[in-house]
Amino acid sequence: MTDEVLFVSRETMGAAWPLCRPFIVHAVNKCGDWTIEQVEHLLMLPTAALWIATRNDIMIATAVTEVDGDQCKIVALGGMGGPDWRCLLQPLEKYAKSMACARMRVEGRPGWQKALPDYHQPYVVLEKRLD
């Protein structure tokens, strides 16, 4: 079994995005904090990056990151289910260090805590919808 994580360059983003988009649509629909249009706009900025994880040459996950000051945020991560997408973490963390980031940040549902045992919860976010 061969896992590979690919950083998508600006030059290949146009060709890669249609393949990645369904994974990210699924992720943003579950989360609700971002729309796919916002993610697409973010990817036009130099602070954002698109990542693809493959296993045996089959795409299993894709992620969007954003460097914001001294942190690298995983904005959206969509995958085939299960822990397969975890192969993304080490390359994303290495990239964050190369961008002078002191930390990685993931904001999401409580299930992320279980999926990311090396990460800690520095605070709790509470919200109330004002419909």
Question: What are these regions, as identified by a protein language model?
Answer:
Residues L45-P83:
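Conserved donor-binding loop and adjoining core beta-sheet/short helix segment
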Residues M1-D3, E11, E107-D131:
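Terminal substrate-recognition subdomain of acyl/acetyltransferases
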Residues V28-A48:
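Active-site rim helix/loop that mediates acceptor-substrate recognition in acyltransferases
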Residues M1-W34:
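Short amphipathic alpha-helix that is part of the acyltransferase structural core
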Residues A15-P22, H26, H41-M44, C87-Q90, ...:
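Charged/polar, solvent-exposed surface patches and flexible loops
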Residues D70-P117:
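Acyl-donor binding region in acyl/amide transferases
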